[in-house]
C-alpha cells in the first residue's frame, strides 16, 4: 500500500505565556509524526514567539499564515485550504499532548485508508465518550474501532443515551474531503459560538447534513487534554499528575475570556424552574443571533 499523505492543520490563538508553553509541549510530543506539511495560522500576542519556535523545528515544512479577519475563524481557515492537498488532515489542538510512540500513526493512517474512515477522533479517550458507541456494530483492526454513523445507528445511540452526542470533533484526523465539507459549510446557520472561535467545527448527532460517514477511535490512548477532565473525574493530565499544574483551567479562562464571575449562579435561585428554562432558551437564541449577525 502507498504511504498515506498527511497535513497538520492548526488555526489557533496563543495569547498568554501558559498557552504558549502548552503549545510547545504539545508540539514536541508529536513533532515526528509523518506529515508532509504543517499549515498553521497563528493569532494572539504570542504569535511571533510561536512562529519562531515552529519555524526553528519545522523549517520548510511550515506553511505559515497570519490571518485574523473580521469574518472569523472559518473564513480564515478556508483561505488556508489552498496549501492543503494531502489525503488526510490532522486538526492540531494545542492543549492536547501525545502519549504514544509517533510511529503508530503510520499504521493508523493505513487502517483509516483501507477502511474508508472519514473522521478519526484522536483524543478524549475515556468511557463517557467511547461507551456511547457500544450500542452499534463495529469493525476492528489492531489499532482502531470503526463505526458506520448511518441515520439508523445515530438514532439507536440517541435512544439509548437519551440525548444527542458529538460524533464530529476538532481533535481529529479527517479525510481532506470531509474536513473541507465541514469548514466550507455555513452550518449551523445560527452560530452556536463566536465567529472568531473554531468550536462550530464540532457537530451534534442532530446535524443531519454531515451524515452518514465512517467514524473511528483508537483502541488505546493517543492524546489527552492537559487540564480539561471532559466530564470524567481524573481524566486530564494534570489530574493524573502527568503535567505540571502551573496555572489552573479557571485561571486561564479568566485571562482569555475575561470572566471573573458567573452571574447565572447568582440570579438562578430567584426564578421558578419553568421560568428559568424559558429565560435560558430566550437568552441562548439572542446569543446565537449576536454570534451570527453581530
Residue ranges and their predicted role:
Residues 6-16:
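A conserved hydrophobic helix/loop-capping motif in glycosyltransferases and polysaccharide synthases
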Residues 15-31:
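Short, well-formed alpha-helical segments that are part of the catalytic scaffolds
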Residues 19, 171-177, 181-294:
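C-terminal catalytic/acceptor-binding lobe
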Residues 78-88:
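Active-site nucleotide-sugar/metal-binding loop of Leloir-type enzymes
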Residues 87-97:
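Short beta-strand-to-loop acidic/aromatic patch adjacent to the donor-nucleotide binding site
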Residues 100-128:
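Conserved donor-nucleotide/metal-binding helix-loop-beta segment in metal-dependent transferases, i.e.
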Amino acid at each position: 500500500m502507498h504511504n498515506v499523505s498527511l497535513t497538520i492543520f492548526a488555526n489557533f490563538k496563543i495569547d498568554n505565556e501558559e498557552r504558549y508553553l502548552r503549545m510547545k509541549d504539545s508540539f514536541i510530543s508529536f513533532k515526528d509524526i509523518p506529515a508532509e506539511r504543517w499549515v498553521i495560522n497563528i493569532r494572539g500576542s504570542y504569535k511571533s514567539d510561536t512562529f519562531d519556535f515552529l519555524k526553528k523545528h519545522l523549517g520548510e515544512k511550515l506553511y505559515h499564515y497570519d490571518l485574523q479577519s473580521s469574518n472569523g475563524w472559518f473564513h480564515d481557515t478556508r483561505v488556508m485550504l489552498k496549501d492543503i492537498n494531502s489525503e488526510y488532515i490532522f486538526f492540531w489542538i494545542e492543549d492536547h499532548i501525545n502519549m504514544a510512540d509517533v510511529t503508530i500513526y503510520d499504521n493508523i493512517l493505513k487502517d483509516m485508508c483501507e477502511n474508508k474512515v472519514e473522521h478519526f477522533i484522536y483524543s478524549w479517550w475515556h468511557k463517557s465518550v467511547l461507551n456511547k458507541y457500544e450500542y452499534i456494530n463495529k469493525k476492528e483492526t489492531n489499532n482502531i474501532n470503526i463505526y458506520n454513523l448511518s441515520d439508523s445507528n445515530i438514532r439507536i445511540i440517541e435512544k439509548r443515551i437519551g440525548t444527542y452526542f458529538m460524533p464530529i470533533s476538532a481533535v481529529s484526523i479527517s479525510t481532506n474531503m470531509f474536513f473541507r465539507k465541514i469548514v466550507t459549510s455555513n452550518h449551523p446557520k445560527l452560530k452556536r459560538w463566536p465567529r472568531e472561535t473554531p468550536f462550530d467545527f464540532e457537530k451534534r448527532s442532530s446535524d443531519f447534513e454531515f451524515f452518514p460517514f465512517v467514524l473511528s477511535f483508537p483502541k488505546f490512548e493517543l492524546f489527552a487534554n492537559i487540564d480539561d477532565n471532559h466530564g470524567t473525574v481524573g481524566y486530564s493530565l494534570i489530574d493524573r499528575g502527568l503535567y505540571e499544574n502551573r496555572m489552573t483551567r479557571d485561571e486561564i479562562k479568566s485571562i482569555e475570556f475575561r470572566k471573573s464571575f458567573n452571574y447565572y449562579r447568582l440570579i438562578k435561585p430567584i426564578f421558578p424552574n419553568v421560568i428559568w428554562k424559558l429565560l435560558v432558551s430566550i437568552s441562548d437564541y439572542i446569543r446565537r443571533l449576536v454570534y451570527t449577525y453581530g
